[in-house]
């Protein structure tokens, strides 16, 4: 069964001096998050960016995928924590998301370091957000 989620953004002004707002239109769990070009390319200063939202989506997705993999291996986690750092940089073709670095830790009774690593590798390959960016962005 397919699911569809919707987000909306508005932008006012030009790229450099303008500003925007992002809303989770399906759930409204967040609304009118401010965003600016400066938040994307310099300091965030309390303002989000598409790259930060991508990192949040990836971290959330990855945490679900690794939890599922660990449970399927017979070692359901008590807790997993996932941090994703998305790096964008200016290239000859313009600004590009270049990599997503994933850091994972957890409390997983009965799991070995090897089985945890195997579950993480499976999550890297199986998480739908990882799949969406794989081939375009370096995943580590």
Which residues does each PLM region occupy?
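Extended beta-strand/beta-hairpin segments
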Residues: 1-56, 63-140
């Amino acid at each position: 069964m397919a699911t569809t989620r919707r987000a909306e953004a508005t932008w006012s002004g030009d790229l450099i001096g303008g500003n925007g707002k992002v809303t989770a239109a399906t759930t409204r769990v967040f609304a009118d998050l401010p965003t600016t070009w400066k938040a994307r390319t310099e300091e965030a200063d309390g303002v989000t960016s598409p790259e930060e939202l991508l990192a949040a989506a990836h971290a959330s997705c990855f945490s679900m995928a690794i939890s599922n993999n660990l449970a399927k291996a017979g070692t359901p986690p008590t807790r997993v924590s996932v941090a994703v750092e998305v790096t964008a940089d200016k290239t000859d073709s313009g600004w590009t998301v270049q990599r997503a670095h994933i850091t994972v830790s957890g409390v997983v009774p009965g799991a070995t370091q090897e089985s945890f690593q195997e579950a993480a590798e499976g999550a890297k390959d199986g998480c739908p957000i990882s799949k969406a960016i794989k081939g375009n962005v370096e995943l580590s």
